[in-house]
Amino acid sequence: MADDPSGSKVVLCLDVGERHIGLARTVADVGTAFPAGFIDMGLPTATARAVVDSVELEGAGCLVVGLPLALD
């Protein structure tokens, strides 16, 4: 898992929806996630490339994928 500058483990969280993938970044030993943007769903290869780019940009060593089914 990648380390952030403080030496903690960086986790990128994905909330996959029909039109967007929401991104949140957290540090494993902190537990609070913060918004990190979103990816518009497009062609599968372009969307996958955008996810890989986000992982690299955030320096994530772990990826957590969620599937939000409702807002309640």
Model-inferred region functions:
Residues 1-12, 47-57:
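Short amphipathic alpha-helices and their capping/turn segments at secondary-structure boundaries
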Residues 35-60, 72:
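N-terminal phosphate-binding loop and adjacent alpha-helix
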